[in-house]
């Protein structure tokens, strides 16, 4: 749409026009497209396809696994309150713990895939897994908690950003509007308080809002003729007529007229950075397209068809002098850009910057959601590892070789029964109630395999299986970096 409009605008730019029907048609169509786009507020959707649900499910899985694999204190009473638990009000603690138990009980109701009768997660306390596995569970849960907090912050920032965008759109459309509420746009009372010229030329009225400028190109100071609106559109509709703009009430009553026409004739585009750029480009190309030999700067800073004089936008005739002049705004200071001089364009640029910020927020939101899902996969692996730890530790304990004494040494030591001193001096093991009453035996001979550490004592640098099968991929547990998750 914008490309076609720009081509039509460029094709008709810098040509001499006389008064007549639709003489401001290009300008009107451009304003209609802008007005429709801003009024519709078709801002990019906050939600991304399926990611919200998947991220929420990922957090539920992470939180559930961490709970059933936590130490007894966390499992029984939940995480510490915001305040230091040592200073926690003892009257408040029972209520907090009760809520935690209620929440924890929901985990038991999560059914195993394909078997609704069995719970998905079983309790696996820390003393039944290796210390390395417990440390990895802690790390993943910390990373996931940080991602979840950042997601909540981003959601708040996105909501605030949307209100700020709506505010700028409202200010562009109508002076004094733009608080994020549904807008009833009207031209500016102050600009039209005296007469047409105060709003449509000079340095105070032009460019304050789209409503002001739209009235300027489609109405006159004195005429009530149907041809007044026909300067902008060929639609003949008694409800679309303008009356004289001497009075504020008439000015405000007239403004909805072109909006009804815009709704019939112009498309409604999505509000994007690209479309804002396109509408500014189209406006720049359209500015000054009606050349007038006697007009100020030959009408270079006039929007619409004005009179061929130095007072081109006086609105004094039904079909000849309806335009808005930005001359005083643009030339007031050397080097002033259009966006710097024309207030409504400045507001569009602010809205565009906020749309860019919104796009970056949405991208960050998607990254955090993807991160949560990756962490959920890792947490599931660690849950399987915790189950494997218990089986492996039990198996190692069962297979540990029994220590047996050397038979020759045993015979030699038996000579020192009831002789504590001699027993010890000959490297034997004494067990007795008195120095002269007791047994002397050979010390046990250790097995050929190294002793196995107990639960929670495994070397933090050992290799841990992540899935519980003998041929599965293994990772080093110390140091635990998870570098691929720290983005």
From Swiss-Prot:
A lipid is attached at residue 470 (GPI-anchor amidated serine). It comes from the Eukaryota. Residues 471-487 form a propeptide. It is found in: Cell membrane. The keyword Membrane applies. Keywords: Cell membrane, Glycoprotein, GPI-anchor, Lipoprotein, Membrane, Signal, Trypanosomiasis. SUPFAM superfamilies: Variant surface glycoprotein MITAT 1.2, VSG 221, C-terminal domain. InterPro entries: Trypano_VSG_B_N_dom, VSG_C_dom_sf. Residues 443-468 are annotated as: Disordered. Glycans are attached at residues 71, 84, 418, 465. This is Variant surface glycoprotein WRATAT B. One of its GO terms (cellular component) is plasma membrane. It is a lipid-anchor; GPI-anchor. Residues 1-19 form the signal peptide. It comes from Trypanosoma brucei rhodesiense. VSG forms a coat on the surface of the parasite. The trypanosome evades the immune response of the host by expressing a series of antigenically distinct VSGs from an estimated 1000 VSG genes.
């Amino acid at each position: 749409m914008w490309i076609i409009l720009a081509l039509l605008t460029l094709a008709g730019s810098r040509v001499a026009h006389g008064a007549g029907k639709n003489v401001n048609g290009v300008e009107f169509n451009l304003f209609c497209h802008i007005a429709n786009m801003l009024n519709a507020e078709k801002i990019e959707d906050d939600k991304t396809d399926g990611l919200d649900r998947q991220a929420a499910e990922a957090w539920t899985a992470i939180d559930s696994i961490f709970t059933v694999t936590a130490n007894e204190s966390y499992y029984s009473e939940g995480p510490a309150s915001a305040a230091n638990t040592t200073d926690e009000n003892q009257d408040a603690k029972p209520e907090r713990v009760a809520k935690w138990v209620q929440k924890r009980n929901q985990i038991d109701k999560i059914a195993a895939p394909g078997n609704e009768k069995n719970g998905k997660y079983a309790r696996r306390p820390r003393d039944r897994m290796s210390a390395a596995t417990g440390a990895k569970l802690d790390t993943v849960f910390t990373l996931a908690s940080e991602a979840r907090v950042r997601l909540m912050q981003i959601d708040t920032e996105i909501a605030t950003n949307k209100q700020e965008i709506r505010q700028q759109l409202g200010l562009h459309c109508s002076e004094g509007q733009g608080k994020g509420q549904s807008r009833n746009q009207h031209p500016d009372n102050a600009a039209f308080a005296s007469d047409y010229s105060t709003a449509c030329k000079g340095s105070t009225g032009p460019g304050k809002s789209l409503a002001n400028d739209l009235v300027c190109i489609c109405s006159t100071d004195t005429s009530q003729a149907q041809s007044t609106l026909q300067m902008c559109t060929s639609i003949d509709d008694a409800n679309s007529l303008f009356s004289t703009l001497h009075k504020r009430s008439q000015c405000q009553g007239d403004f909805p007229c072109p909006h009804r026409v815009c709704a019939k004739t112009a498309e409604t585009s999505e509000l994007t950075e690209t479309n804002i750029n396109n509408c500014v480009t189209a406006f720049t190309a359209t500015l000054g397209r009606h050349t007038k030999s006697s007009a100020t700067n030959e009408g270079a800073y006039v929007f619409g068809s004005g009179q061929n004089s130095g007072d081109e936008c006086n609105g004094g005739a039904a079909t000849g002098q309806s335009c808005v002049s930005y001359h005083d705004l643009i030339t007031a200071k050397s080097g002033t850009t259009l966006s710097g001089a024309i207030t409504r364009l400045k507001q569009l640029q602010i809205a565009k910057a906020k749309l860019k910020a919104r796009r970056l927020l949405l991208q960050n939101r998607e990254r955090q959601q993807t991160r949560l899902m990756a962490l959920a996969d890792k947490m599931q692996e660690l849950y399987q590892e915790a189950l494997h730890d218990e089986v492996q530790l039990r198996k190692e304990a069962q297979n540990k070789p029994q220590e047996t004494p050397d038979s020759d040494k045993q015979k030699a030591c038996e000579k020192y029964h009831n002789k504590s001193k001699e027993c010890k001096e000959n490297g034997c093991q004494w067990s007795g109630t008195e120095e002269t009453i007791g047994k002397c035996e050979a010390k046990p001979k250790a097995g050929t395999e190294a002793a196995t550490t107990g639960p929670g004592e495994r070397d933090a640098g050992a290799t841990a299986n992540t899935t519980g099968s003998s041929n599965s991929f293994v990772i080093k547990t110390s140091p635990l970096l998870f570098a691929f998750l720290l983005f």
